[in-house]
């Protein structure tokens, strides 16, 4: 009987489990009568060692072995476990000891899925009230603040790092963080910040004005998804260890908000080669472990503000597998209801004006987007989403202004590109059904998340499906979306892009938030009316927590701040 081994990482020295796998491959589950010499030859050891190994396996309940004694009495061997059962048992013991990485490394993909189904029994044996476990759908690709773009990375970076300013979502206003005070000159071209004394990074190195200056200059000088947003920084001047100033090319009343974003989190000047995956931060949690299977955060005992209420947060990478209900907290839960909050922005379409279908024809681009939006392709009563009338919930943008005599081509194919986490099947089916009305076919290409943001696929795309989620500061979140989103900037030809940049430059010079919000709406009206961006839906944010989890404060990004979580008795 030949079977595939459950173990996929053999070691140079044969392990007991591998010896059992050899026996199972030779004899299977049937009763066998091998002599000790034959067993020693199979296990590549002496007869004495073979006898010892068989005794160990019998003690563990893997097999029953009765040696033959005397002439005519044959030995009898019966194997009681399949290698898969044995591998799972070994993995369960490792998980119970907290050795998740070793457990997964020893199993092939089907057995890993089986192990996940048995997690509830394993977790039930753990009564650690200071720990919280939650699943995540994919690995974390970077923990360097200036590279963080997706909200998973952004949220974890916010737990590991702090910024000069913090933001209160309830009042939609800035509050002190690493800096306890800041002020601007009359035209907002020069900003000065004063730091709290005694600040340190997780490794004990000082967090002073020089460290802040070096960290902020990275935003302007190093490659990152939001580098474009800091091009107006002309110079940084340190006055003394607790104070520094920023000189800007243009007046910018949004400068403190720029320094609140996750990309502006303060990193140490000296960074190890593995900083991208194992960073040293300054936030409420510090990184204890980062492996392909798990991310572990531990409370920072020297945090300058209120200490987190939990000691340990574990994020388990489950890939596409369904997460068992035994986890304490589940973000983006599959089961949603109309009572769940809507995401802070929307899922939307970007047309590629130079793609194969549009080929620079503006009338065709506007005509197709109007056809896709009038009426909404979504069906009523969908618990996971609502039709988007504008970029934000509650906003209403004008319809796409298509030319009356624009005739849509009948038939053909349009290629839609998206990334895995922004491709709700119901929404894509609705677009397919709408296009079928003109005999057109939608070819959907789902691109792995890191590759999506390299945009090497752009020239082959006609439409791009994306999703935007703002952070708690809705004001600067809109500015960042309109001015810094790489997909939107690629979709705009030079003329419209220059107009949007000019509008945003004017917005940053408005000192009042209300005036800026009106200006954002005007930008959104223009983008939608001209067919450069089409809001489709507002997704609902699913969040499920155990009955004993308290302190749930869900921000506009949909994530819960780990610092406020605690367990009820």
Q: Where in this protein do the model-derived segments appear?
A:
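Aromatic- and charge-enriched surface segment that lines or borders ligand/interaction sites
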Residues: 28-32, 42, 47, 51-53, ...
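Ligand/substrate-recognition segments at binding pockets and active sites
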Residues: 29-37, 43, 47-49, 61, ...
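Surface-exposed binding/hinge segments that line
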Residues: 76, 227-270, 284-289, 294
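N-terminal lobe/hinge region of extracytoplasmic solute-binding protein
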Residues: 135-184
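A structural "hinge/loop" feature
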Residues: 139-153, 205, 255-261, 544-563
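A bilobed periplasmic-binding-protein/Venus flytrap-type ligand-binding module shared by bacterial periplasmic
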Residues: 298-301, 341-367, 371
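Ligand-site clamp/hinge motif
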Residues: 302-344
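Detector for C-terminal structural segments
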Residues: 367-399, 422-430, 459-569
